[in-house]
UniProtKB/Swiss-Prot annotation:
UniProt name for this protein: Large ribosomal subunit protein uL1
BP term (GO), one: regulation of translation
CDD domains linked: Ribosomal_L1
Record keywords, A-Z: Repressor, Ribonucleoprotein, Ribosomal protein, RNA-binding, rRNA-binding, Translation regulation, tRNA-binding
InterPro entries membership: Ribosom_uL1_bac-type, Ribosomal_uL1, Ribosomal_uL1-like, Ribosomal_uL1/biogenesis, Ribosomal_uL1_3-a/b-sand, Ribosomal_uL1_CS
Species this chain originates from: Chlamydia felis (strain Fe/C-56)
């Protein structure tokens, strides 16, 4: 049997596919799975009881994970003049205005998150077909369209992430690294759940957190009991 096959078999023995676990149990299972040679990202996939086709049931926002993401972000800032200088001084990786717009039009997207000052959005808006599908478009709801670029950069460095329900009503997000202490991962996930619950549209009826799965990059998807998450 190959090393890969042994790893998969070991994972399959570690939990019951048909069962929903508490959040702590799910994290413990992931951390007990055979390791790989890199620090895996822990992801969550949350099916929401919304109709994303309706404008009053679309969900998008941001949340600051209390323990960060463990990821070093490449931050781009669309700004000019004094705001561009502030962004550079605050540690942004890429700062520019029309020059960056043209570069991105040419296909360059080698960054993880974009921030823009309001006066830049007229030009940045033209990049919708490039940035939109990659969830890189700055938005006021996510706090990435702002005059306070210094604050935005600091929050992103500390672990602020954006969440958004896709066309199927599913929200996917990275919530830390598998090397994190289990309690730190739990706190990050609870912070995301709290933000999602606060963002529940008034028009959404019935069960809101329909299903919840936590996984690692190379690990299994573990089903989590949504009743615990709604109560936390």
């Amino acid at each position: 049997m190959t090393k890969h096959g042994k790893r998969i078999r070991s994972i399959l023995k570690s939990y019951d596919f048909s069962k929903s676990y508490s959040l702590q149990e799910a994290i413990d299972i992931l951390k007990q799975c055979p390791t790989v040679r890199f620090d895996q990202t822990v992801d969550v996939s949350i099916k929401l009881g919304i109709d994303p086709k309706k404008s009053d049931q679309q969900i998008r926002g941001s949340v600051s994970l209390p323990n960060g993401t463990g990821k070093t972000l490449r931050i781009l800032v669309f700004a000019a003049g004094e705001k561009a200088k502030e962004a550079l001084d605050a540690g942004a990786d890429f700062v520019g205005s029309d020059d960056l717009v043209e570069k991105i039009k040419g296909g360059w997207v080698d960054f993880d998150v974009a921030v823009a000052t309001p006066d830049m959005m007229r030009e940045v808006g033209k990049l919708g077909k490039v940035l939109g599908p990659r969830n890189l478009m700055p938005t006021p709801k996510a706090g990435t369209v702002t005059t306070d670029v210094v604050k935005a950069i600091a929050e992103l460095r500390k672990g602020k992430i954006e969440f958004k329900a896709d066309r199927a009503g599913v929200c996917n997000a990275g919530v830390g690294k598998l090397s994190f202490d289990g309690q730190l991962l739990k706190e990050n996930i609870e912070a995301l759940c709290s933000a999602l619950i606060k963002a529940k549209p008034p028009a959404a009826k019935g069960q809101y957190l329909v299903s919840f799965t936590v996984s690692s990059t190379m690990g299994p998807g573990i089903s989590v009991d949504t009743r615990e998450l709604m109560a936390s």
